[in-house]
C-alpha cells in the first residue's frame, strides 16, 4: 500500500514538473538583414544616381519607386513573430540592417509604409564615400531598442591590394596570413563604411555592426584582399568592444560578397562553424555556414546558390542559460512570391527589371534572440 502511494506521488510530481516546463515564457526579438538592391529615389542630387532617374537607364519613375517601397515593406513586415507561443501574431523585426541605400530619405519613406508604420522605426544612417553612392543603415523599433552611440568606421583600401593579389595568384595560399600588400601612395578604392551601433535591447546592452563588403568586381580571387581587409576591420572592431567589456554582446551582419567558407570570413574575421568552437568572449559563431553546407542560398552568384548575407554573433549570445538574450535559431526568408517562377532565372530572387518592379536580388536573412521571463 505504501509502495502504491509512493508511485502515485512520484507520478504527480513528474506531472507538476512537466506543467512548469510547459509554462515557461520567453521574450523573442527578430534581427534581420536585407540587401534592398538599389533603393534609390527619383530625385536628381549630387550622388551618383543618374541611372535611377525617370529619364535614366532604369526609367525609374515615382510609380516604380513607390512599388519598390511597398514590396520591401511587405517582406520586412512578415519576418519575425511576437513570441514563441504565438506564431500567429507576426511582428516585424526589432532590428533591421540594410544595404544598397541611397540616402536617409529613402529609409524615411520605407518606414512610413503602411505595413511598417505601426512598428515606429528609428533610423541610424551615415553617408559613405562609396563610388556607387550606396550606404548601409540600421532600422530599430524605438519601443524596444534605445541607441546610445553610433559611428561609421571607414574601410581604407587601395587598388594596389588588388594588383598585389593578382601577382600572387600562383603562390600557395597561407591560411595563417590574412594580410594583403598595401601601398599607401596608391589609388584608394572608396567603398561602404562599417556601421557600429550600441544600444539597449529591452534594457540589455548589445552592439550591432552592419556591413556591405566590397564587391567581386574584377573577379573573386583578384578582389578577395578587399573583403579580407573588411573582415580584418570587423575583427578589430569586435576586439575593441570586448576589450572595453569582456562580456560584450556583438552582432555583425551584412552582405559580405563572400561565402562563409571564404578567407574574409573564416580567417580575417575568424568565424566558427560550431558553437562548441567558441573559447573566448570575442569569438564569433556563424549559423549560416551550416545552412550553406545544407544547400540553402540567399542569392545566386554566377548561377550558383550561395549565402553572402550572414548574421553572426559573439560567444555571449550562445551561453546555455536564457536569463538574458541568447541566440535561438537562424533562417532565410524566401516566400514563394519573392521567387522568379519562369524563364532563365527560375528559382532566383525576384528582382527589379525594366518591365517589373520586384524585391531584390537577395533574400533577407534573420536570427531569433530569446530570453526567459519566468
Model-derived regions: residue spans:
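Structured beta-strand-rich core segments of catalytic domains in phosphoester-bond hydrolases
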Residues: 101-205, 213
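Active-site metal-binding loops of divalent metal-dependent hydrolases
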Residues: 36, 101, 213, 255-256
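Active-site-proximal beta-strand elements of phosphoester/diester hydrolases
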Residues: 30-38, 149-150, 205-215
Amino acid at each position: 500500500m505504501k509502495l502504491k502511494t509512493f508511485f502515485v506521488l512520484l507520478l504527480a510530481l513528474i506531472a507538476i514538473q512537466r506543467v512548469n516546463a510547459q509554462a515557461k515564457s520567453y521574450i523573442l526579438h527578430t534581427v534581420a538583414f536585407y540587401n534592398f538592391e538599389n533603393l534609390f529615389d527619383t530625385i536628381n542630387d549630387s550622388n551618383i544616381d543618374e541611372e535611377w532617374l525617370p529619364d535614366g537607364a532604369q526609367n525609374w519613375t515615382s510609380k516604380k519607386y513607390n512599388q519598390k517601397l511597398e514590396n520591401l515593406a511587405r517582406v520586412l513586415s512578415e519576418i519575425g513573430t511576437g513570441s514563441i507561443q504565438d506564431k500567429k501574431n507576426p511582428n516585424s523585426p526589432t532590428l533591421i540592417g540594410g544595404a544598397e541605400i541611397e540616402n536617409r530619405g529613402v529609409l524615411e519613406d520605407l518606414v512610413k509604409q503602411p505595413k511598417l508604420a505601426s512598428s515606429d522605426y528609428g533610423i541610424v544612417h551615415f553617408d559613405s564615400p562609396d563610388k556607387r553612392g550606396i550606404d548601409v543603415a540600421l532600422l530599430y523599433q524605438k519601443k524596444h531598442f534605445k541607441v546610445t552611440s553610433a559611428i561609421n568606421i571607414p574601410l581604407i583600401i587601395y587598388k594596389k591590394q588588388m594588383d598585389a593579389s593578382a601577382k600572387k595568384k600562383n603562390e600557395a595560399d597561407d591560411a595563417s596570413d590574412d594580410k594583403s600588400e598595401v601601398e599607401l601612395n596608391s589609388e584608394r578604392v572608396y567603398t561602404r563604411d562599417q556601421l557600429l551601433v550600441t544600444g539597449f535591447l529591452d534594457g540589455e546592452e548589445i552592439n550591432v555592426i552592419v556591413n556591405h563588403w566590397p564587391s567581386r568586381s574584377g573577379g573573386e580571387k583578384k578582389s578577395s584582399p578587399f573583403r579580407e581587409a573588411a573582415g580584418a576591420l570587423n575583427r578589430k572592431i569586435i576586439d575593441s568592444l570586448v576589450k572595453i567589456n569582456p562580456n560584450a554582446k556583438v552582432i555583425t551582419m551584412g552582405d559580405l560578397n563572400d561565402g562563409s567558407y571564404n578567407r574574409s570570413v573564416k580567417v580575417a574575421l575568424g568565424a566558427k562553424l560550431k558553437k562548441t568552437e567558441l573559447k573566448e568572449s570575442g569569438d564569433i559563431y556563424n549559423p549560416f555556414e551550416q545552412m550553406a553546407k545544407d544547400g540553402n542560398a540567399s542569392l545566386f552568384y554566377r548561377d550558383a546558390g550561395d549565402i553572402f548575407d550572414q548574421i553572426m554573433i559573439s560567444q555571449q549570445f550562445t551561453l546555455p542559460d536564457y536569463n538574458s538574450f541568447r541566440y535561438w535559431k537562424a533562417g532565410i526568408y524566401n516566400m514563394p512570391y519573392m521567387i522568379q517562377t519562369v524563364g532563365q532565372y527560375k528559382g532566383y530572387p525576384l528582382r527589379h527589371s525594366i518591365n517589373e518592379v520586384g524585391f531584390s536580388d537577395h533574400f533577407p536573412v534573420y536570427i531569433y534572440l530569446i530570453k526567459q521571463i519566468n
